[in-house]
C-alpha cells in the first residue's frame, strides 16, 4: 500500500545519483552505485530486504519509505554496523536506541502537534474523527501524537482503524458524519487517501480532510 510513495522516494534518489554520480573523499573520487531492493511494504520482508542489501556490501542505506518497515529493519542495520539514513520515515522508534540510524525529516510528535494546532486554529475544529490502518506503525503512531496534542487544545477525538487492504470506507465516513466531527484526520498511505477522498465526495461529505506528510 506504500508502493506509490516508495517509488517516488527511489526516483528522487536515482535523480540525485544521475546529477551527482561521484563523491570525493580524502582526495579520491569514487563512483556512487545504487542498489535497490523492494521490501514490498511488509515488516516481515523488510528484514530480508535489509539483509539482502548488507550482502551486497553497501556502504550506506537510504530509506526506507514507511515507518513500520524502517523500524523492522533497524536492528539488522545496527548489527551490521552500517549507517542508515531515513528520508521520509517519521516515527521516533526508528532511530531510538540505534546509533547507526539517522534521518533528514521531522518526527511525528512535531507533525502531530502542528496538525492539531492547524485543526484548532485554522479549521476551528472542536471534534476530530481520526482514521488509520490497523497495525500500521505510522498511522497509529501519528494518530496518537495528534490525539494527545488535540486534547490538550480542548478538542475531542474519535479514533477508528480499518484493516489492511480495505477498499470501502463508506461506514467509516458515515460514522465521522454521525459523530458530528468537524474534521477528518486520516494519516494514511497515498492509495488509501485517494479512496477516502473519492468516497467522501461521493457521499456528499464536505468537512475538511486533514492528512500528513504522505
Locations of the language-model features?
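Beta-alpha junction/loop-to-helix N-cap segments that form part of ligand/metal-binding clefts
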Residues: 4-11, 19, 23-95, 104, ...
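Short secondary-structure boundary segments
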Residues: 65, 89, 132, 188, ...
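Residue-level signal for short, function-critical loop segments
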Residues: 1, 40, 133-135
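Short, surface-exposed alpha-helical segments at coil->helix boundaries
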Residues: 3-14, 43, 113, 139-147
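An alpha-beta-alpha
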Residues: 101-164, 182-183
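A generic secondary-structure signal
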Residues: 19, 23, 52, 117-122, ...
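Extracellular/periplasmic bilobed ligand-binding domains
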Residues: 77, 142-214
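Loop/turn elements at helix/coil->beta-strand transitions in domains of secreted/extracellular proteins
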Residues: 29-33, 56-60, 79-84, 97-100, ...
Amino acid at each position: 500500500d506504500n508502493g506509490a510513495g516508495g517509488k517516488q522516494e527511489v526516483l528522487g534518489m536515482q535523480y540525485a545519483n544521475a546529477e551527482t554520480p561521484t563523491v570525493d573523499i580524502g582526495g579520491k573520487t569514487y563512483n556512487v552505485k545504487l542498489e535497490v531492493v523492494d521490501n514490498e511494504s511488509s515488516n516481515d520482508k523488510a528484514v530480508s530486504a535489509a539483509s539482502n542489501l548488507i550482502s551486497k556490501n553497501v556502504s550506506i542505506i537510504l530509506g526506507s519509505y514507511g515507518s513500520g518497515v524502517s523500524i523492522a529493519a533497524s536492528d539488522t542495520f545496527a548489527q551490521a554496523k552500517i549507517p542508515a539514513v531515513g528520508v521520509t520515515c517519521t516515527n521516533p522508534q526508528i532511530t531510538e536506541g540505534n546509533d547507526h540510524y539517522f534521518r533528514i525529516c521531522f518526527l511525528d510528535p512535531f507533525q502531530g502537534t502542528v496538525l492539531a494546532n492547524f485543526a484548532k486554529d485554522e479549521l476551528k475544529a472542536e471534534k476530530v474523527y481520526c482514521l488509520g490502518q490497523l497495525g500500521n506503525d505510522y498511522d497509529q503512531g501519528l494518530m496518537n501524537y495528534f490525539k494527545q496534542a488535540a486534547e490538550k487544545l480542548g478538542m475531542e477525538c474519535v479514533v477508528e482503524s480499518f484493516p489492511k487492504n480495505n477498499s470501502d470506507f463508506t461506514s467509516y465516513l458515515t460514522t465521522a458524519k454521525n459523530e458530528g466531527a468537524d474534521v477528518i484526520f486520516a494519516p494514511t498511505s497515498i492509495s488509501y487517501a485517494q479512496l477516502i477522498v473519492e468516497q467522501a465526495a461521493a457521499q456528499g461529505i464536505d468537512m475538511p480532510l486533514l492528512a500528513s506528510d504522505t
